[in-house]
Amino acid sequence: MLVARESLAEHYKEVEAFQTARAKSARRLSKIIAAVAAIAILGNVAQAFAIATMVPLSRLVPVYLWIRPDGTVDSEVSISRLPATQEEAVVNASLWEYVRLRESYDADTAQYAYDLVSNFSAPTVRQDYQQFFNYPNPSSPQVILGKRGRVEVEHIASNDVTPSTQQIRYKRTLVVDGKMPVVSTWTATVRYEKVTSLPGRLRLTNPAGLVVTSYQTSEDTVSNVGQGAP
């Protein structure tokens, strides 16, 4: 578009005013966008904080179930809140499982038993057990039996010696390929503590939250299969 010379000054003023207005509009729009973004960020932060305070950290909680005399089923999430007979049953079952896996042996399930007994034990008890079971200890069932035999154990009785100590009698049967099984009876003395800070993965196999702090076992009798065991 041609502009007459006498109108150039006026035209330049109009162009300058237009550019100035556009610049102001752009700056104003940028400020509005920045304000909206800041509000959105603050809103997201507030929402995240609200969710974090309303939703507790997830953790694995064992639920204990038992059948009442009338046939109804009841449950509890804390072993300390169980009826006395039910709490005792959970502790007895957990301690027997520990003794059973520690004293029995089968090559196919040896790794599972080793891991559970280790996780169930206090550091000194765990160290003693692992030194006994691992190579190259000549007394380890891995060395003596390997895949040629197995050790089976059966529960006889459990008796509380003190509130945190239990004696468990069990029958032990040594089975070796090509030989007659040997049956013996043993007594394990287990001292334990109840803890509440076990990781969730350990609660799956140790719902009572027990840690064995001392473990001893002694042989009572030995007999061959076919003869009466005391």
UniProtKB/Swiss-Prot annotation:
Topology in membrane: Single-pass membrane protein
Q: Locate the coiled-coil region(s) and give their ranges.
A: none
Per the record, ranges on the Periplasmic side are 62-230
User: Any idea where this protein resides?
Assistant: Cell inner membrane
Bilayer-crossing residues are 39-61
Cysteines paired by S-S bonds = none
Query: Could you tell me the superkingdom of the organism this chain comes from?
Result: Bacteria
Keywords, comma-separated and alphabetical: Cell inner membrane, Cell membrane, Crown gall tumor, Membrane, Plasmid, Transmembrane, Transmembrane helix
The record ties this protein, via InterPro entries, to: NTF2-like_dom_sf, VirB8
Q: Which family does it belong to?
A: Belongs to the virB8 family.
The identity of this protein, by name, is: Protein virB8
Organism encoding this protein: Agrobacterium tumefaciens (strain 15955)
Lineage here is: Bacteria, Pseudomonadati, Pseudomonadota, Alphaproteobacteria, Hyphomicrobiales
